[in-house]
Amino acid sequence: LALIVPLIAGASFFYNSRVADEVIEEIAVIEQTTITSTSTTVQSNLKPQVPISCKASSNFNEDFSCENLYDESNSMWQDNSLGCEDTVLEFTFSDTIYFEFIVIQNAEKSSSFIRNFKARDIRITTDQSDYQVEKELENDNFQQWIDLNTDANNIKIEVLSAYPGEELNGQNPFTECAMQEIKFFGKS
C-alpha cells in the first residue's frame, strides 16, 4: 500500500500536466484561425475587452465602485445596502465590439461571499434594441460564463432577483449586493 499510493499520485500528476499542455496548445491554435475565401482574411482574436467607463445604480462608497468589476483584483463593487434591489450596471466600450461571452465572478473570499447578497436572476441588454438575455446565476463563488454573441458598444446588466447574505460564525449578514469581477470577451 505504501508503494501503490505514491505511484498513483505520480501517474495522476503526469497525466494532468500532459492534458493541460494539450489544452493550452489547442487554445493557441484556435486563436490563430484564418478564414479563406477569394482572399485570405485573418480573423481578429478573441480577447478580453475592457470598458472605458461604467455606471451603477448605486455604490456603497467610492471604494466599492463599479470600476472594481474590471480591475482584475479582489476588490468588489457593492450597492448602497439595497440587497441588489433595482440594481443596474452599465458598461461603455470605446468601439462597437462583437461580444462572445462574459464571465461573472461573485466574491471569491468565503466570508464576503457568504455574508453579502449576490445576483441571482439577471437581464443583459445592449444598445442593439432587440437584444436581451436572461440568466439565473448559481449561488457559488466560481466564475460563471454567459454567452452573448452580439455586437455592442454598451452593455447593461439588471439584477432581477438575489440570493440573500447569510450569518457566518455569529456575524450578521451584510445588506449590500456584491460582485467581484465581470470579464467581457469579444473581437473588435
Each model region followed by its residue ranges:
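Disordered, acidic Ser/Thr/Pro-rich linker "stalks" and the adjacent N-terminal cap
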Residues: L1, I24-T92
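Hydrophobic single-pass membrane-insertion segments
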Residues: L7-E25
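A generic alpha-helix propensity feature with a strong bias for hydrophobic helices
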Residues: A9, P51-C54, E167
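Small/flexible residues
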Residues: A20, T34, I122-T125
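Aromatic, loop-rich ligand-recognition surfaces of beta-strand-rich domains
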Residues: E67-D130, F142-S188
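Short proline/glycine- and polar residue-rich coil/turn motifs
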Residues: K135-D140
